[in-house]
């Protein structure tokens, strides 16, 4: 599933082909995604794109006619291709530009979304989102305070979008390993020093993943079709029964919150 670094990589990849250019039209081949594609998007003709930003795992396209909000879902990806590029299976959505290019959304599982709003501050899917992990707002004081009343597993706590956005399953595993913290540790037992270490490591891991173009495990590709290379640096995720890169103990896997969790029982004692 594309996580924050993959969406940031997508944002950087598509921006040069969209920002400042004109949308000639939007083609919707299958409106039935996770939420039905907003009908307003079919009315877009000769609309200028002003900017592109990201909120959590949502891609936001700022236009003269409001905001186009995209989410890649479980297996979605976007590519920049020429107008005459053949349409493939699962190509559900195109933003056709006036520069000979188009943004094409492909999603086999149809669990993504393309929505519209004229007011970002009132967009319902953003109401309960926590701070961006790479922002100054997300600091150790905030994380420590937020953890005080939480009896959930630390990994579940970090993946809660109301606490902080964008720390998905892959990166949560890597972050906890680097911090030497067991994924089942109860969040409210976190010390101030551990909160400081977590915040530092979250920022470090996500920044490095963005620099590497995200993580390609199955479905994600960068907008130019290249894979993300952070997968080559994964220390514990997907490495069950392989030796820990630090101590040689076999990596274990357990289910936490219906997600596979990988850890070293020696380096990450409960």
Curated annotation (Swiss-Prot):
The keyword Zinc-finger applies. DNA binds at residues 90, 109, 150. Its EC number is 3.2.2.23, 4.2.99.18. PROSITE patterns: FPG_CAT (PS51068), ZF_FPG_1 (PS01242), ZF_FPG_2 (PS51066). GO terms for biological process: base-excision repair. Transmembrane segments: none annotated. GO terms for molecular function: 8-oxo-7,8-dihydroguanine DNA N-glycosylase activity; class I DNA-(apurinic or apyrimidinic site) endonuclease activity; damaged DNA binding; zinc ion binding. Keywords: DNA damage, DNA repair, DNA-binding, Glycosidase, Hydrolase, Lyase, Metal-binding, Multifunctional enzyme, Zinc, Zinc-finger. It catalyses: Hydrolysis of DNA containing ring-opened 7-methylguanine residues, releasing 2,6-diamino-4-hydroxy-5-(N-methyl)formamidopyrimidine; 2'-deoxyribonucleotide-(2'-deoxyribose 5'-phosphate)-2'-deoxyribonucleotide-DNA = a 3'-end 2'-deoxyribonucleotide-(2,3-dehydro-2,3-deoxyribose 5'-phosphate)-DNA + a 5'-end 5'-phospho-2'-deoxyribonucleoside-DNA + H(+). SUPFAM superfamilies: Glucocorticoid receptor-like (DNA-binding domain) (SSF57716), N-terminal domain of MutM-like DNA repair proteins (SSF81624), S13-like H2TH domain (SSF46946). Binds 1 zinc ion per subunit. A zinc finger (FPG-type) spans 235-269. The active site is at 2 (schiff-base intermediate with dna), 3 (proton donor), 57 (proton donor), 259 (proton donor). Belongs to the FPG family. PANTHER family: FORMAMIDOPYRIMIDINE-DNA GLYCOSYLASE (PTHR22993:SF9). Monomer. Involved in base excision repair of DNA damaged by oxidation or by mutagenic agents. Acts as a DNA glycosylase that recognizes and removes damaged bases. Has a preference for oxidized purines, such as 7,8-dihydro-8-oxoguanine (8-oxoG). Has AP (apurinic/apyrimidinic) lyase activity and introduces nicks in the DNA strand. Cleaves the DNA backbone by beta-delta elimination to generate a single-strand break at the site of the removed base with both 3'- and 5'-phosphates. HAMAP family: Fapy_DNA_glycosyl. This is Formamidopyrimidine-DNA glycosylase. It comes from Histophilus somni (strain 129Pt) (Haemophilus somnus). The gene is mutM.
């Amino acid at each position: 599933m594309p996580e924050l670094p993959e969406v940031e990589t997508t944002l950087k990849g598509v921006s040069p082909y969209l920002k400042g250019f004109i949308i000639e039209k939007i083609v919707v081949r299958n409106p039935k995604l996770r939420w039905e594609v907003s009908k307003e998007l079919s009315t877009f003709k000769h609309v200028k794109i002003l900017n592109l930003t990201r909120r959590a795992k949502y891609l936001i396209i700022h236009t003269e006619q409001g905001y186009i909000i995209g989410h890649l879902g479980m297996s979605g990806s976007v590519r920049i291709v020429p107008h005459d590029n053949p349409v493939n299976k699962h190509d559900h959505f195109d933003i056709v530009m006036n520069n000979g290019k188009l943004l094409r959304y492909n999603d086999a599982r149809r669990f993504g979304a393309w929505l519209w709003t004229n007011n970002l501050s009132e967009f319902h899917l953003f109401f309960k989102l926590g701070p961006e992990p790479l922002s100054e707002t997300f600091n150790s004081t905030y994380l420590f305070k937020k953890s005080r009343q939480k009896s959930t597993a630390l990994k579940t706590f970090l993946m809660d979008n109301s606490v902080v956005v964008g720390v998905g399953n892959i990166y949560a595993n890597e972050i906890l390993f680097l911090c030497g913290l067991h994924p089942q540790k109860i969040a409210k037992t976190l010390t101030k020093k551990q909160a400081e270490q977590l915040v530092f490591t979250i920022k470090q891991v996500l920044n490095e993943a963005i620099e590497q173009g995200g993580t390609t495990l199955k479905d994600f590709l960068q907008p130019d079709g290249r894979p993300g290379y952070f997968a080559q640096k994964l220390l514990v995720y997907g490495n069950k029964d392989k030796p820990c890169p630090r101590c040689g103990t076999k990596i274990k896997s357990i289910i936490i919150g219906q997600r596979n969790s990988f850890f070293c029982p020696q380096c990450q004692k409960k």
